[in-house]
Amino acid sequence: MGGVRSEYELSLRVQGRFFHPRDYGNEMELVQGVMIPGYATYCNVRDAIIYRDARNVAPEPDDRRLLALAIDSKGLPREELYRRSGMDPDSFKQSLARLYQSLNLVRTARGNYRTLPVNRIYEPEDARFYVVKRLILSFGIVSAEGLGMLLKGEIPMAELRKILLRLEKEEILVKGFLKKDSETLYWIVKDDMEHIKGHLFQGSFVLNQGDRLAHYLSEDVKKKFGLGACNVIFSS
């Protein structure tokens, strides 16, 4: 998925001892920002640049003052950034929010605000393809509508369908009516087809509503239990 949201999300995916994502900050140069989907997420700098490329929002002229101040990779605390900016509180708050939401500013593991390297890794369309492809590979099976919901509507449905078609042509995905008693068309990772035949889930865990898997399964949970955001116990 190109990042991790929280310590709890990490705990479900790592066997043995682990630390909070921020504790890996210096070793892996992790940053936190509003990635895609639009959650506060820890990831490495390269992935953050790709997310920024995909979002493709240029900073407004009035925001460039903050960018110039936060250019060091160590970043600046919010209070120090405000003090140096010379801006009034409301303008500073709005400018900081715009830059953070667009990934022109991110936060270091210590919580300081910093910029990312200015050079692109991908052009916007290619960056969005990369982001969507990795998201699909993470979950394994998606419908077009479910993918749109998973991305919180950030990428237009027409573009998502174009990406799904491209992944079909590249023989990464295959499609079909894969869910019992459902007329919804699904795409699944081609290489997974042989591995999942005859397999049933075994084990138990609590799926926290802050986990992206909970967002992925939210419609199924709503249909089965009539509930919105909630923690779900899986056991077999």
Regions inferred by a protein language model and the residue ranges of each:
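Phosphate-backbone binding and catalysis cores of DNA-processing enzymes
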Residues: 1-91, 97-107, 227
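Accessory beta->alpha helical hairpin/"wing" motif in late/C-terminal subdomains of nucleic-acid enzymes
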Residues: 33-52, 96, 107-125, 178-192
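Short, amphipathic alpha-helical interaction segments positioned at domain boundaries
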Residues: 58-63, 117-140, 191-210
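Polar/charged alpha-helical tracts
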Residues: 64-68, 83, 158, 162-165, ...
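Short aromatic/basic micro-patch
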Residues: 75, 141, 187
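A local structural micro-motif
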Residues: 90, 106-108, 144, 175-176
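Contiguous mid-protein beta-loop-alpha structural module that forms a pocket-lining wall or clamp
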Residues: 115-183
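Non-catalytic regulatory appendages
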Residues: 174-235
